[in-house]
UniProtKB/Swiss-Prot annotation:
Name of the featured protein: ER export of PMA1 protein 1
Topological type in the membrane: Single-pass type I membrane protein
Keywords associated with the record: Cytoplasmic vesicle, Endoplasmic reticulum, Golgi apparatus, Membrane, Signal-anchor, Transmembrane, Transmembrane helix
Gene behind the chain: EXP1
Inactivation phenotype: Lead to ER retention of PMA1.
Quaternary context: Interacts with PMA1 and PSG1.
Function: Specific cargo receptor protein for the plasma membrane ATPase PMA1 that acts with PSG1 to promote the transport and maturation of PMA1. EXP1 and PSG1 probably act sequentially to promote PMA1 sorting between the ER and the Golgi, with EXP1 promoting PMA1 export from the ER to the Golgi while PSG1 has a role in PMA1 maturation or quality control in the Golgi.
Species of origin: Saccharomyces cerevisiae (strain ATCC 204508 / S288c)
Length: 149
């Protein structure tokens, strides 16, 4: 590939990355007309440094990206609706939120299953395997045991 091919590939990749939020429905791009810089310069004395820089940035950006509101997208988008319905616990030490998957019982004596049933199932499996081995050797125990050694 020559230089033009790489340049074209780069433009396609950048355009695809820029358009991904539009395809997924997260937000929209808006083109705005830049406002005159005279109004921004005259207000320099009244505004602080942070406000001045924020207004200057707003005036210079022609292409703006706006995220959709969560209230609007709850009814329309199933992905955001499922993420909004998740429950979180707040950790008391760090204050960070943690996703709640389920409440678990930490009592070691409380089981979800019956141990006797599991033991009986294992015994049945062992009997079935032994019967299969005996059928393989046609009920000849001595030959069956010799085959295992």
């Amino acid at each position: 590939m020559n230089l033009y091919g790489y340049f074209l590939l780069l433009i396609i990749v950048i355009a695809f990355i820029a358009l991904l939020p539009l395809f997924s429905g997260i937000g929209t791009f808006k083109l705005t007309k830049p406002k005159s810089s005279a109004t921004a310069q005259s207000a320099t004395g009244k505004l602080g440094k942070r406000e001045y820089l924020k207004k200057k940035l707003d005036h210079t950006n022609v292409l703006k990206f706006d995220l959709k509101d969560t209230e609007e997208s709850l009814g329309h988008d199933s992905a955001s609706a499922s993420s909004a319905s998740r429950k979180f616990e707040i950790d008391s030490k760090t204050g960070l939120k943690r996703r709640v998957i389920g409440q678990y019982n930490k009592d070691p004596n409380d089981f979800d299953f019956d141990i006797d049933d599991l033991i009986n199932e294992d015994e049945l499996d062992e009997r079935r395997e032994e019967e299969k081995k005996l059928k393989k050797y046609n009920g000849k125990k001595n030959e069956a045991y010799e085959g295992f050694v």
